[in-house]
Structures are given as C-alpha cells and as structure tokens.
Amino acid sequence: MTELYIHNGRDVSGAPVAVLITDGVIAEVGTELTVPVGCPTLDAQGCYITAGWIDDHTHCNAHAALYYDDADAIGYRTGVTTVIDAGSTGADNVADLYQQAHRAATNVYALLNIARTGIVAQDELADLNQLSFSALRTAIQCYPDFIVGLKVRVSKSVVGDNGVEPLRVSKQYQADLTAQLPLMVHIGSNPPELAAIIALMRPGDVLTHCFNGKPNGIVNSTGEVAQYVRKAYQKGLIFDVGHGTDSFSFRTAALARTAHLFPQTLSSDIYYRNRLNGPVYSLAVCVEKLLLLGYRLEEIIPMITTNPARIFKLTHKGQLCRGYDADLTIFQTVTAPQIVVDSTGEERIAPTQVIPTYSVIAGRVYTCGIDK
C-alpha cells in the first residue's frame, strides 16, 4: 500500500485542508486527519490545495509540425495534472499521440480533429476529402478512454472557401456516433461569420477562443456582446477561453464579464512557441489574467477542475473528494504586481502572481518547474 499525507494547506476559501492518499486515490479529506504511523507527509504550509488543474485546450503532440509541445512541460511542471490535446491529431495519426501519452507523467487525453490528418497544415479543412465518418468512428472505437471529444476549427485560414460546411458535417458526425462526445469549435477570422457558426451549435457544445478580440468575435460594432451570442450562452453554449497566441483580449473578456457571460472553462491553447515567448506562458498566467479582470479564485478554480472534468466526462477527476483520483495542485498566490499582455498586445498590471509548487498525479509528487 502506497500512502501520502498532505497537510497544513487551505482550500480556496481559506479553510484548512488536509488530504490522505492511498494507492493513487483520495482516501480522506478534512482539516486534520489521523494517519498511519510512518506515513510519508508533504507540508503545504502557505499553499492552497485544490483538485488537479485540467487544461482542456492544449497542443501537446510533440511530433506535430505547427503546434507542438511536450505534455509534461505544459503539464505537471506548471501545476497542471491533466491536459487535453485539442485537435492536433485526427483519425489517421491519433495512435501516435496515444503512445506519447503513455510515456508522460501528466494525464493526457485528446479531442479528435474532425479532419483525419489533424493539424498538419493551417488549412486542414479546405479540402472536404479530409472528412471521413468511418475513419473517425474507428479511431474512437480504438481509443474510447483516450478520445474525450471532437474538435473542428472554423475560421477562414482553416476552411478556405468551405464556410460552415465542416461544422455542419461535424454536427452530423457527432449525432451519428454511439459515443456521446462533446464538440469543441474554434472560431477566428471570417468568413464564415460567427452568427452562422453559432446557429449550428447546440447546448453543450464548446466555443473556444470565446474572448478573442477579432472583428468576427462576440463583441459587435457597437462595443456590446452580440444578442445572438447572449441567447446561445443562456441556452447552454459553453464558453472556453482558449487564450492562445491570437485569441484572448482583455477588452472582450471584460465586456463579457460585465454582461454576465462567464467562461465555464479556462484553457491556455498552449504550445511550444507561446509557452516560451508568450503571451500564454502557462495556465497559471491565464489564471492571473482572470484575477486582474475581477474574477475571484473561488470562481476560477472550478473552470480548471470541476467544469472541464464534467464536460469531458473525466469522471474521477476534478474534485478534492474521497474516491477521486489523487490528482492535486498545490500552489501559492503572492501580491507582486507584474505586467501581463493579451493577444492584441494590450498590457495590464496583474496584482497577483499564481505560483504552482507541487503537482500530485495518482499520488506521486512532482515539484513544479523541475524535471523528473
């Protein structure tokens, strides 16, 4: 039996919290626990303890040509215990990503790109021959515990002259699959117009890059969130941040917050270049940006734990509860103002730094920023 006792921490409300882990599973959670003699301990003094962070929009296919990274570099080393690769691979090459996932310490899952080759070029959906229901279904049947959703990119640079046709086909494929998988939809430059995209989306679909500052975004020419966007949100359209190199605007995010349109999930859209050169850097930096916009830590943590676990049916993750996987993130917050920048180049002062200290994955402790 492998055990670990983590103590002297606090939850995001500030209440004391301690966690006993047995054989990779959370055995007990409380303020102070009775533990077996000789049980290894980890002192979390001065730190928050939460369920392990989940980044539901990353690009961690190390073999990809355009958007690539190492799962552990964007995962446990930055306080993230679970990453979901958002469409780097399709039916033709998801097997390779699956093999990479098994070599990582970080939990890795995949959203299968509707294009069978995934993102091998920027315009993977300019050719509709990339779409194959039989190939998609076979891949999902081969990796049912690895593929947790579908991904379609619907912007001019991706679809070429095909407009919303790839999205229409994606919705048909989604309906025809035996597996009930969520669909993440990337938005960006037009055509197609955002209104035409959202018209095809349904409650439970995930709109990623929701706070981009592009002309084809959620904010209309009068500086308000478009009415059709509000209606879709109220009916259950899921907002995912998907920060990325080009897809997060402080102004758009602030306007949405004023309109009470809050993201259900906070994701980074991280890959090698925007991790090293910004503006993303890490999921923790994305947390800092929502904090500066006025979100409270108690509002943000569910966006990177409970909510993505529910949406993508990671049934034993996302909660600091008995019986759940022993995936935890231990982190500090420090009042230390710093300049942060969005995808439009706008700089703002973030008053709080979020510093991950330890990632715990299946009961094993990893020091953030340190290699295995």
Task: Briefly describe each language-model feature range.
Residues R251-T333:
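His/Asp/Glu-enriched, well-ordered alpha-helical/loop segment
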Residues M1-T50:
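Histidine-rich, glycine-flanked metal-binding segment
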Residues A44-R103:
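Metal-associated gating/positioning segment near the N- to mid-region
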Residues D325-D371:
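C-terminal cap of metal-dependent C-N hydrolases
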Residues G9, G24, G46, H57, ...:
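Divalent metal-coordination and catalytic microenvironments
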Residues V152-A256, H260-N277:
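Active-site core of metal-dependent hydrolases
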Residues T78-I84, S88-T89, R103-L128, K151-V158:
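Metal-cofactor-binding active-site regions of metalloenzymes
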Residues A64-A73, N129-I140, P191-I197:
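Short, acidic/polar
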